[in-house]
Amino acid sequence: MPRSLKKGPFVEDHLLKKVDAQNDKKDKRVIKTWSRRSTIVPEMIGHTIAVYNGKQHVPVFVNEQMIGHKLGEFSPTRTYRGHGADKNAKGSKKK
């Protein structure tokens, strides 16, 4: 269920303050954050935000297509290594 329009998008205050401060200085340093739940807003376009995935900070470069999505969508928390190989697939078939 999406958030109500009268409330507006959720963005952590500390993250928005850091983005606004860099916009005022015209600075584009990497911003580290643990806030995966923050919504990407137009002020963040062009910034690189390092989002924590539980192990490390994954750099996410924000562009126009990401507006309205959450930061956590671009920092996967699980690694997929593929399904296990079939033991009989190597060539030793039973007859």
Curated annotation (Swiss-Prot):
One of its GO terms (cellular component) is small ribosomal subunit. Keywords: Ribonucleoprotein, Ribosomal protein, RNA-binding, rRNA-binding. Disulfide bonds: none annotated. It comes from Deinococcus radiodurans (strain ATCC 13939 / DSM 20539 / JCM 16871 / CCUG 27074 / LMG 4051 / NBRC 15346 / NCIMB 9279 / VKM B-1422 / R1). One of its GO terms (molecular function) is rRNA binding. Residues 73-95 are annotated as: Disordered. Protein S19 forms a complex with S13 that binds strongly to the 16S ribosomal RNA. NCBIfam families: rpsS_bact. Belongs to the universal ribosomal protein uS19 family. This is Small ribosomal subunit protein uS19. Gene3D superfamilies: 30s Ribosomal Protein S19, Chain A. Coiled coil: none annotated. It comes from the Bacteria. Pfam families: Ribosomal_S19. GO terms for biological process: ribosomal small subunit assembly; translation.
